[in-house]
Amino acid sequence: NINIIEVDLPLEEEKEDYNKRLENFFSKNSKIHHCITFTSKAHIVGEFLQRTNRRNIQIMGYDMVKKNAECMRRGSISFLIAQHGYMQGYNCVEALFRAIVLKEEINPVNYMPIEFLTRENVDFYQRTQI
């Protein structure tokens, strides 16, 4: 039986506000052992868990940004999904060019690669450029 419980962490809050929200959330939901964040801010939760010595919670986050990588190396983030922002941006501009300038029909589906990073492979990750 899976139960999904959400906590809202607005992107522009102060660290103290995040700490209050997270302390309240994890105190009320002490049986939570897995989290996922859908922004590049997984480090906010990872840093909180490390600071409060909550070691039995796994986090999966998005984006290989410096703070997320640091949390992963320390073990407070378990997994990261790395996306290729440069490639996504390039493909968007190219699709616009082909549609507007060349008047070509554009495929509405454009699958992009992602990479699943762990503590063991994070130091070997090389962000691919165009």
Segments predicted by a language model, with ranges:
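Terminal, non-globular segments
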Residues: 2-4
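Hydrophobic alpha-helical
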Residues: 11-67
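Short, solvent-exposed amphipathic alpha-helical segments in soluble enzyme
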Residues: 50-54, 76, 98
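Flexible loop/hinge segments that line or gate small-molecule binding clefts
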Residues: 65-77
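Short beta-strand elements at the ligand-binding edges of bilobed clamshell
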Residues: 74-86
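Hinge/cleft segment of the Venus flytrap/periplasmic-binding protein
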Residues: 84-130
